[in-house]
């Protein structure tokens, strides 16, 4: 499933955090992209920056939102759009 895998490239002097997936031209402009991979990459970044407590809060909010299922994107079986999914995660923070 696109949109679930975070990625990190960590070197001695720099670190880059990103979503790990290809493009999805079939959903371009439809506002149904799953934001989880990018948010999970942000959680990895927070951990890297010694903010593990904040990273855990974000991961928990994402997991709770997926479990609730009411505003997830169609790729996760929901009927929500990207904004609704992200808003639901923010509300749980």
Residue ranges with predicted function:
Residues 73-93:
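Short, amphipathic C-terminal "tail helix"
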Residues 1-57, 61-70:
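Glycine-rich phosphate/nucleotide-binding loop
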């Amino acid at each position: 499933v696109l949109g679930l895998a975070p990625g990190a490239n960590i070197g001695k002097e720099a670190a880059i955090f990103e979503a790990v997936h290809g493009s999805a031209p079939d959903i371009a402009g439809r506002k149904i992209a799953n934001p989880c991979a990018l948010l999970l990459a942000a959680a990895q970044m927070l951990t890297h920056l010694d903010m593990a407590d904040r990273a855990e809060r974000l991961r928990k909010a994402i997991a709770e939102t997926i479990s609730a299922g009411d505003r997830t994107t169609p790729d996760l079986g929901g009927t929500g759009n990207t904004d609704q999914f992200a808003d639901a995660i923010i509300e749980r923070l």
